[in-house]
Regions:
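Terminal-region recognition feature
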Residues: 22-239
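N-terminal chloroplast transit peptides
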Residues: 1-18
Length: 239
C-alpha cells in the first residue's frame, strides 16, 4: 500500500487585538508595530510567466516586467524601483504621442494599463499613482489575473478600472522589520504612519470602501473576487 507523506507547514501569526475603529489613526496603528517600517509593501508571491513568444514587444519595454506597444502597456510580476521608472517613462511617452495625434489627426486615445502583479515597492508605486493623475491622457487599468498589495494601488488610480471575471485583488498593510535605537524606531514608526496615511487616502478617495471596512481589509490577507471588487468600488466594470 502506497504511503502518502504529508508535510504540514505552520505559520505563526502575531496576536491582533480587537479595536474600535473610530478614526483613521486607529486603522494605521492597528498592528503596525509588528508589521512595518520600510518603503515596500508585502507582496503575494505568485509564479511568474513570460509573455507569449508570438507577441512582438518593443525592445525598450522588455526590462523590469514592463511590456507593450503604443497605448497598450502591461505590468507583469514584482513592482520595483527599476520597472516603475520605466513605466513612468512609458506613460509620459504615451501621453505625448496621444497629444500629438490629437492635434494632428483629431483622434483621441487612451492608455490601457494591464496589471498582473503580486505587488512590491511602495514609494515608486505612489509616484505612478500620482503620475496617472498628472498626465493629460486617460489611463484605463485592467486587472488581468491578480493585482495585489501595491499593484492594487496603481489599479484603483485608473480613470476607468476593469477586471476580468475570475481575477482578484488584495489590499493589506505595509510590512517590514523594525530595528535600531529607540529614537530611530520612533522615527521609523512616524514614517510608517505617514505612508499608511497615504495608502489609506488613495483607497478612501478612489473606492467605496468605508474607514471601518478598510481597517478590516488592511489587517487581513483576503483575496477579493471580481464581484466584490465591483461592489467595493475597486473597479468600475467586470469584463
Amino acid at each position: 500500500m502506497r504511503l502518502l507523506h504529508l508535510i504540514l507547514l505552520s505559520s505563526v501569526y502575531a496576536f491582533i487585538p480587537r479595536l474600535n475603529y473610530n478614526s483613521r489613526r486607529d486603522i494605521l496603528y492597528a498592528p503596525i508595530m509588528t508589521t512595518f517600517i520600510s518603503s515596500s509593501m508585502g507582496k503575494i508571491e505568485i509564479p511568474q510567466h513570460s509573455p507569449p513568444e508570438e507577441v512582438s514587444f518593443q525592445p525598450l519595454l522588455h526590462k523590469g516586467g514592463i511590456y507593450g506597444s503604443q497605448f497598450n502597456v502591461r505590468v507583469v510580476g514584482e513592482i520595483s524601483e527599476e520597472n516603475c521608472a520605466q513605466l513612468a517613462d512609458v506613460l509620459i511617452n504615451c501621453d505625448n504621442d496621444a497629444k500629438q495625434i490629437q492635434e494632428s489627426e483629431n483622434i483621441s486615445n487612451v492608455i490601457s494599463l494591464h496589471i498582473t502583479s503580486g505587488g512590491g515597492a511602495l514609494l515608486p508605486t505612489l509616484y505612478i499613482c500620482d503620475l496617472i493623475q498628472l498626465i493629460d491622457t486617460d489611463v484605463y487599468t485592467f486587472v488581468d489575473g491578480y493585482a495585489y498589495s501595491s499593484a492594487s494601488l496603481i489599479s484603483v488610480c485608473g480613470n476607468k478600472r476593469f477586471i476580468t471575471k475570475h481575477s482578484s485583488m488584495l489590499i493589506h498593510q505595509l510590512s517590514a522589520d523594525i530595528s535600531g535605537k529607540f529614537v530611530e524606531i520612533k522615527d521609523k514608526f512616524n514614517n510608517a504612519d505617514q505612508l499608511m496615511n497615504n495608502v489609506a487616502d488613495i483607497y478612501l478617495s478612489k473606492t467605496n470602501i468605508t474607514l471601518q471596512k478598510l481597517a478590516y481589509l488592511l489587517q487581513h490577507e483576503i483575496m477579493l473576487n471580481s464581484t466584490t471588487c465591483l461592489e467595493l468600488g475597486l473597479v468600475d466594470e467586470i469584463i
